[in-house]
Amino acid sequence: MSAALATVLTFTTPALLSPLTASVPGRNPDAVMATPTAPARRLAVSLLGSVLLSGCHTTTPAQQAPASPAPAITESRIVATQPAATGPGLTPSQRLTALADTVTATPGDATTALPYTYLRTQSWTRATNAITRADLRQWRRDTDGSGQEKVRRLPDLPGLNHQPERHEPALFTRAPETTTEHLSGGLHPYLPEPLPDDAPILADMLASRELANEPAYPRLLANGVVALASTQYLNQAQRATSLRVLAAIPGITYRGQSADIVGRTGLTFTITADGSISQLLVDPRSGEILAAHEWLSGRRPGLFSAVLILERGHTTDTGTILRP
């Protein structure tokens, strides 16, 4: 293992062993953020996780590899999408590039002048011998890093073999809510703005090119893209760039069209590397990452982590909730 990869793994591995790692990509002491602080470093691999995607098999092209053992496949859906991204005979890289070339604007793209970036995620993450679960709403003032977080946690689930189920997202509404106010500098984006519009440069920021020959490199790139999308707002151009980063991941495969556990449909892409299987669900119109999960094999197999990215946009103040 190279010294550079050893450094990356030193940053990320402890996140799996803390009971609070899963949940709060903000300033919670055990959460993960995207600056050189300890919380920042841990998010890079804490936001991918279990069975958020379903129905990945019926529309999968025949030439693709078999579906991963991680998700429970229960339902298949056909998604209205850009014809270029789902045309016959395309490689996974060509599909992602075609989608990047045709991503559409979202309502949030028209509100970037508002002072607060708003994100809501639900996450499932491996701790030492359990899965932690949390619903996070975060408002971050872009000019100074102040803001607010509201977190709801469900009881930890013993063991590592849990796969998020359709009834779980609604359970968060019954959980007690904790509100944390952050002063200036308390919250950080995953990467500093403005993000580069060049995919190779963005990829190097997410996973150093020095690691390109390491078995973990595809996994690190995928984790980085999901962490980026989970913790800061990506506008139309930035979404296109992030899709081009995914398109360049070695060995990425296309699994067809599927739905996540809250019923949203998208295009499913899989990365198998370094003893893990990751799946990303991508909106076929906006290019937004809707959900992601990662499943580990090896000595302690099971769920690594999972994320549903439910709401994103911009608000005039904290506490304002946006609906998808």
What residue ranges belong to the model's regions?
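Intrinsically disordered, low-complexity prosegments and terminal tails associated
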Residues: 56-324
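A general, composition-driven signal for non-globular sequence regions
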Residues: 21-23, 30-36, 40-41, 51, ...
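Secretory targeting and sorting signals
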Residues: 1-19, 34-60, 246
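Terminal targeting segments of Actinobacterial cell-envelope proteins
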Residues: 15-38, 59-60, 65-73, 77-78
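Intrinsically disordered, low-complexity peptide-like regions
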Residues: 11, 24-28, 55, 281, ...
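Residue-level marker of intrinsically disordered, low-complexity segments enriched
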Residues: 2, 6, 22, 30-31, ...
